[in-house]
Amino acid sequence: MLKNIYVTPLNLLKSATSLQQQVRTTFVLKRKYDPPLHKTNEKPRRMRAKNFIYELVDDTLVKKRPNIEVVLKTFVEGVGDKGDVVSMKPHFVYNKLLLPGLAAYNTPENVAKYAKTEAEKSTVKHSSPYAQRTVNMLETIVLAVVMNKDEPWVLEPWHIKASLRKTGFYCREECITLPKERIEGPDLKKENKDFYCTVTINKLEQARLKCRLHHWSTDPSERLPYVLEHWKLQSEPLLDVCSPEKTP
């Protein structure tokens, strides 16, 4: 008798064949033609085909979503420092801040929890959210320092300042620290040779800037051949010239 009993297999742990996910699409519509009126307590009149024509009022799928406020748990480059309350786009907040655990939602509890302590306030590691980004950009470029081929010169901070201005960076001469050894010319042996200088940002961050010497003449017949994309080529360090030491 027990052999005739049909045993139903359990599929409790069986994986689903398709992914069912909620779709957040809401459309606000309005009728183009109003439906016909009917008297009270009477059967509504039959609507015609034109009464089922709708006009789109609002599409929430393409509607811009408001920014989300979060509290940063640590320093985030280009965003802010620990304890700062920032308001940014939802897509960036979810993928770059909340999922990696760099921020939490803006609540009074989280603001008090992730606020800076007195010891952290006294120790300043970053002068601004964008200072480290500037350091990274300066350390990835090869700065072309164009010097005169006909007249004698001595490399000074304002030469580096002018070369940086050509590439879109603006800084003061006091922020530039040249190597200890004197660099003077013109000297074609130093053509396309590299040396390093230090750029100080907001009197805190320091960037190690790679520079490359080029000689230029106002006389077209005396000019050196043009080198295409010189920063991609390998070069030798400038003889007896070392990079300046970073101040602690």
From Swiss-Prot:
Biological-process GO terms, alphabetical: mitochondrial translation; translation
Q: Name one GO cellular component term.
A: mitochondrion
Interval spanned by the transit peptide: 1-25
**Keyword annotations for this protein?**
Mitochondrion, Ribonucleoprotein, Ribosomal protein, Transit peptide
Q: Provide the coiled-coil residue spans.
A: none
The superkingdom of the source organism is Eukaryota
Report the locations given in the UniProt record: Mitochondrion
Q: A GO molecular function for this record?
A: structural constituent of ribosome
The family classification in the record reads: Belongs to the bacterial ribosomal protein bL9 family.
Assembly and interaction partners: Component of the mitochondrial ribosome large subunit (39S) which comprises a 16S rRNA and about 50 distinct proteins.
The protein's name: Large ribosomal subunit protein bL9m
Give the organism the record lists: Drosophila melanogaster (Fruit fly)
What lineage, starting at the top, does this entry show?
A: Eukaryota, Metazoa, Ecdysozoa, Arthropoda, Hexapoda
